[in-house]
Amino acid sequence: TTTIKAKKALSVGNELIKKIADNTHSLESNILKNTTIAISCGDAIRGIENPILKTNFKDLFTSLNRNLEIAGSINNKKFIIEAKKTAYNNTLLYDLGEIKDAKFDFYEPLLANSIKLGYANQDYDDLNGRDEFNNTSEFKAPITRVNKLYDLTAPYRADMFGVEFTRINLQGKTTTDNNSDNDVFMLDVEYDFTDADGIENYKLRRPAFTSITGLIDPPSAFNIDLSPKRIFNKHGAWIRGMMWPLTTEKITFQTTDKNPLLKTVQGGVTIQENADVVISDLEPNYFIPITAKFETIVPENLVDIMQSNSTGLFQFTHNGDTYKGWVIACSQKPSTDVEQQWTLLLSADNNINKLIHA
């Protein structure tokens, strides 16, 4: 058994925010407080004394978003990170009334016909490394309107063989002569005990799956809950929104660098890394990838409305039908009553059958 130093994701984030803001802001996050993800580095895994975790907030946020699907906001000198679904609040903020002329169109920045997710592929000097499942996986979507990649890869690693090879092959060496020394690793952990010095100790999480196949040594495996297919599922609501209205179609698995065969069953739920995905099996989508553009007079208290709930919905009526959406863009000239341009992203509960004409 090897003990390595690691930090909680919330602790790393808070340190980075304070450094960026010169101690004027802090990080608040229930999702990071409760996550099982800890952050370590190559030097810590090797057992180097006083290891330094070299990272930045962009890499931290991008990596945590990959695994947790998060969104960030600022409020009263606090940077807040929570689940992305909280940014798609269905609370109605304001009814803009009847709109004379509205233009509806697909919002292409939210469309993609291929999906890449997971972790940078690694080269190992060991044949067993081919069993690694936390690599980059690629999927093909049925969309033909665009030729674009949706990228859910990020810098932090979670490959168990990378952790093990770093620990076993280099443990106790005092020089920083390995490619993984400065790499940042995610570890899926659970609380174990608090020692006499008051330091919390954690152990690697190894969930009790009903069945697990596709690995050489399943009992020793870890970081399974950080796998690419689980990343896919975590972003399921967003991906389903991107694919609208192709709910009966499939997103097909294409390739991965090493092991595509990992399959687990737990609580009646099967997760297979190389399985295709029926879009309708994903979580309900937050949005429809359609924008409504129109001009109307902006309410005088628009700023107050937006500050009260920056993630709420605006509503309008067009040709007798009511629509709701989140603000992508709007402008305000308080000194005039001139109509201003609005752009809303439609929420998933809109009925837009009348708009589908091609």
What is each PLM-predicted segment?
Residues T3-L10, L92-N259:
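Acidic, small/polar-enriched beta strand-loop surface segments
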Residues K33-A112, K116:
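Short beta-strand-centered interaction patches in the first periplasmic/extracellular domains
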Residues K333-D349:
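Short, solvent-exposed secondary-structure boundary/capping segments
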Residues I81-N89, L345-K354:
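Secondary-structure transition/turn motif
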Residues T1-C41, P51-T62, L117, L127:
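Polar, S/T/G-rich
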Residues I297-N319:
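Short coil-to-beta transition motif at edge beta-strands of beta-rich domains
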